[in-house]
């Protein structure tokens, strides 16, 4: 990564937050090895960083059996049309969640929004129409920042995370790319929402595709 986030607006805001909290962000750095006895990690270029507590996340890959079934790409994820969420090799196969190779986050919100799109497209197939919905890469995610505060990002394939209010434009109650106690409690509350509302099929005020209402789009125009 080139910063705290992959897109400029969020990178500037989250990068400043890291600096405020005394967190050093080391960019363009790929781990090559870990020396536990010295408590250092080394990069592929030979640079070293000492650590107190190391939390390492390995590269994500799909399952090997997908290669054998000839539905995957070179990373073992299923080769997926990023809008229709269909296999590029098998017309009657839909893919959802972490199994896809669409350029979106491997987040639970992505799978949820994909499910809404796929449900509509399955109905179109059953009814024999071409009234397909198209997934725009909609993703949102809480980021816990400490001391019972959190931030929130909401973005898509085409639109990067922007400041604003979510899910109700201008009302919220959650603040996009802002650090607040309400965001933190929203994250904690989501567990109850997931088990008691989402899994039971209740309607939620979250559209499968991202909307710009309530977001500071002037930051896009000024780029």
Protein language model features and the residues they cover:
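Flavin (FAD/FMN) cofactor-binding core of flavoprotein oxidoreductases
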Residues: 4, 134-151
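FAD-site-proximal beta/loop scaffold in flavoenzymes
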Residues: 38, 47-116, 123-124
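Internal hydrophobic alpha-helix adjacent to the cofactor/substrate pocket in enzyme cavities
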Residues: 111-137, 143
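C-terminal auxiliary extensions adjacent to catalytic cores
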Residues: 153-223
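Short, electropositive alpha-helical surface patch
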Residues: 110-117, 149-155
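Electropositive phosphate-/nucleotide-binding environments in soluble metabolic enzymes
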Residues: 8, 109, 116, 174-179, ...
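A Rossmann-like FAD-binding core segment of flavoenzymes
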Residues: 1-76
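FAD-binding beta-loop-beta segment adjacent to the flavin cofactor pocket
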Residues: 76-94, 145-166
